[in-house]
Amino acid sequence: SSRGLGDVYKRQPFAIALTIFSFFQVGFNIEDFKRNWENRKLVTDTLFNPKWEWAIENASQALLETIQIAILASILGCFIALPLSFYASRATNQTTVTYLIYKSFLNFIRTIPDLFWAMLFTVAVGLGPFAGVLALVMFSMAIMGKLLSETIDSIDLGPLEAAKASGARHNQAVFTSALPQILPNFTAYFLYIFELCIRASVILGLVGAGGVGRIIETQRIFLRFDRISPIIVLILVAVIAIEQFSVWLRRKIL
């Protein structure tokens, strides 16, 4: 409508001013941009001249390690989050104190970035894939806890109340009536989180948490983009293959 367009036009000066202010706040300088843009030749000349033999020989094992980190972390994180989610849902936890404790715990974990967890665990247990697994366990647990607790909030409470009326204890009623309702969602969330962990495990390697990211960071330091580019392609192929497998498995199960 004309009124809607008028409101948009009125807000344009504010949006432009906010954009300009943001440029200054992040330290954007057109002269620095032009000067640094000249360095692109160093990147493009090597980036598009990939060393495939080197990448396959040196990065294949690390890529497999990345996938293994994601598998282990997503399994552990999601299954730890499963019981926690019931305690963090009003539908299955009627005790306000414990509900707030578990809900706050999951919120706290979710607010901390996975990179921080990786840096924390590399200090605690040392560099390597074990630190990456622990970091992604926290990452997976936080996401699954949020998604699943919100799903539990919307379940049909009829079977739960019927189980309690027939004499079942609260935990028994939850196990027999609430759990079956959320298992399809749990499976879908697990596959989604596994895909996220594949991508995240690559990034965590940049801070020494194992996987192929460690090799990428080492080659970046030496400006060997000719070795980085084929590794990125290998990661892309692996991610696409895993996503397709995930879609196929989701259709079969759900």
Which role does the model predict for each range below?
Residues 123, 199-235, 254:
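Glycine-rich helix-loop "coupling/hinge" segments at transmembrane-helix boundaries
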Residues 170-204, 226-235, 242:
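Transmembrane alpha-helices
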